Amino acid sequence: MNIINEHISFGDRRLVGQEKAKHQIERILLSDRLAHSYLITGPDGSGKTAFSLALAEVVNGVNHLTDLKDLTISKKSSWFTHPDIHVFIPLPSTVGSDELQSRLELLAKDPYEIVDFTLRPALNDAESSKNRRAFYPIDYYHNEIRPKSVYKPNEGRRTVIVLTNVDTMRKETANAFLKLLEEPSGNILFILTASQPDQLLPTIISRCQQIRLHPLSKDEVAEGLINHDGVDKNDAELLARLSGGNYSTCRFLDIETLQQIRNESVEFLRFSYTQDVPELLNLINNWNKNLNKENQIALCNTLEQLLRDITVYRETENESLITNIDQLDVIKKFCTSMTEARLEEMIDNIQQLKGLLYQNVQFKYIGTALSLRFTRLMRGLDPAIDSESSWKHLPALIN
């Protein structure tokens, strides 16, 4: 029996966007020539985990994320209950078995749930900022992952092992895993995901067939929110504009909070330009105290989009190209005031410092450093501290 036919659309019940990657997977499945390992890469929130779970289900005939019609071969309701599908996520240094199980249960309910310990340290506390860097320790590999690789399929076509965020593997674990990739059994299928494939051993990449996902467009994010999350069209469009292509994260955002963030991001630029230190410190400290990580990332995306709108309008004066059209008056005023502003460098600084949020650097340090840099870049001046001496800025911001 074929895995799929031309009447089946991969991931049609849940996957958001990524039509090119979907068609690539459909061609693979139609050819009936599965590789032993696939590496799904793409930015955070683009759907890597959802794609890996959907692929695992289709290979073993589970009619869930994809409507398999008459090609269903499993009676199981999803990958979560299938005996031949094993899913692993990176773990922090201390974690209970119940805690891991609860995250997999969440993922079973929705493949776009954020279950990464680094991004979401606690499931029951949205405000938690506890540092829980997660990775694949060597004993996790030897005790949990490798034993599953010798299992023969019980009822499916393959024993499928899904490893999310393999770019967090320590060198010792990566070398051990490489040996497994080099000598796979005929019945095993590895599906790996990575946001930063450049952090992987080149030999691991060479052993996998790659499937690349791109940042989701604003329309794709909005469509996902409307169709799968029941979000109002206007709210979905606002969330999508501020998502940075990250569908997973924007599902956690509150509309009222986002509206406040939009207004305060304008104040941040204004205070940075006027060098109003008391107001800046008050604003930054409030963000550090009251915004969780998802909202802090949304704040960075808001600032970035606002600066892109200022850039576009300064170059074209074409209102139809502005994303935040309701803030057109603000954009025009900034263009008039900041005629020498080095906007691209300001955007680069946001992207650079946003990465530190994922490393659990406190926002009060990030916001302070950003405002100090903006003060000079807005005037067309070099930052007071050059990029080669970033350690002088704040100890927390060492590159």
Predicted features along the sequence, with ranges:
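Charged, glycine-rich active-site and insertion segments that engage polyanionic ligands
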Residues: 1-79, 186-189, 195-302, 306-399
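Structural recognition of the conserved hydrophobic beta-strand(s) that form the central parallel beta-sheet
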Residues: 160-164, 177, 188-194
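Conserved catalytic/switch belt of AAA+ P-loop NTPases
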Residues: 150, 175-189
